[in-house]
């Protein structure tokens, strides 16, 4: 797997979960002898929703809700076969979305 790169992108609503998962991935990759670049924090995506409080009148009275999606990006340069096997066996929390691309 020489001259290849694994790009890992993590997404989660809770920044503590995503930082914990990123640290676990970095530790696993370094233990198997790969070079890790990152984690790089990407911009947080904020979705805002305005909802009327009243079912009938008072249009000016609203509740505001938001969902924040935190993202991290890391590159694993020159991964070995051990690195790939260790990453496949890694158990991450359920609230973290992981995208892995081989380049």
Curated annotation (Swiss-Prot):
Annotated GO MF terms: structural constituent of ribosome; tRNA binding
UniProt keyword terms in alphabetical order: Ribonucleoprotein, Ribosomal protein
PROSITE patterns: RIBOSOMAL_S10
Presence of keyword Ribosomal protein: yes
Any one of the GO BP annotations: translation
GO CC annotation, single: ribonucleoprotein complex
Similarity remark: Belongs to the universal ribosomal protein uS10 family.
Protein role: Involved in the binding of tRNA to the ribosomes.
Summary of subunit composition and partner proteins: Part of the 30S ribosomal subunit.
UniProt protein name: Small ribosomal subunit protein uS10
Organism of provenance: Ralstonia pickettii (strain 12J)
Gene: rpsJ
